A protein has these predicted regions:
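Generic recognition of long tandem-repeat/solenoid scaffolds
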Residues: 81-87
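Basic, often amphipathic N-terminal segments
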Residues: 1-77, 92-180, 193-212
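Small/polar glycine-rich anion-binding or flexible loop at a beta-alpha turn
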Residues: 182-190
Length: 212
């Protein structure tokens, strides 16, 4: 059982590395998970409608070609790295479209978010001044100017195994490496309990056409 390890990575190691990403599902975050101000059906319906309106304001596009990259994360009070798929930099039009969509999701959906409790703030430390400002205002620290689109593939990597896992994933993902990603929809995921995996609720097509 469990996730299938790419060739060159032991099953037990891959099960550990895939545990956190599997909890969230294969995705790229545009608006970080948050608790609703109210769990009423009306609140959830209003959130769905707001998501639909955001999606309707944006046209679909292709990202720059994807590549595998190590990104940094604080884990157990130390700086660690994890692997993610990210678009190559330098495509101004694609980057502008991504930034606009992310900004819309962050700002327009924030009215549905319950305030963070102190535990949520504390678990993000250490933070820079800008990260703390974002966290307190928007519920997440890597947003707006600090946002970077990425598709998380692993949890924190053991330093002595990072190169091995990276090489194995590069080979496993050869069909998608150096290929663009079609950005044609956004999805709303829900979670009834923080211990349970996320569940896809609704998919919204990016529906803007023409210059409107």
């Amino acid at each position: 059982g469990g996730p299938v390890a790419p060739a060159g990575v032991e099953h037990d190691l891959w099960t550990t590395l895939a545990k956190t990403p599997a909890h969230y599902g294969l995705h790229a975050t545009l608006k970080a998970p948050f608790e609703l101000r109210s769990t009423s059906e009306g609140m959830l319906a209003a959130l769905r409608e707001a998501c639909r309106k955001v999606a309707e304001r944006h046209a679909s596009w292709l990202t720059a070609p994807l590549r595998l990259q190590r990104l940094s994360v604080h884990s157990d009070e130390r700086l660690a790295s994890f692997l993610a798929l990210v678009p190559r930099q330098g495509d101004a039009a694609s980057e502008s479209a991504m930034a606009a969509l992310e900004r819309d999701c962050v700002t327009e959906l924030d009215r549905f978010r319950a305030p963070l409790d102190q535990r949520d703030v504390d678990r993000r430390e250490p933070l820079s001044r800008d990260e703390r400002r974002n966290l307190l205002r928007w519920g997440y620290h890597h947003v707006l100017d600090l946002f970077r689109f990425h598709i998380t593939l692993t949890g924190p990597l053991p330093p002595e195994r990072a190169a091995q896992v990276e090489a194995a994933l590069n080979q496993y993902l050869e069909p998608v490496i150096d290929k663009p990603l079609a950005m044609d929809s956004v999805c709303l995921f829900c979670q009834t309990d923080r211990a349970l995996p996320f569940r896809l609720t609704t998919r919204f097509a990016l529906a803007r056409t023409g210059n409107a």
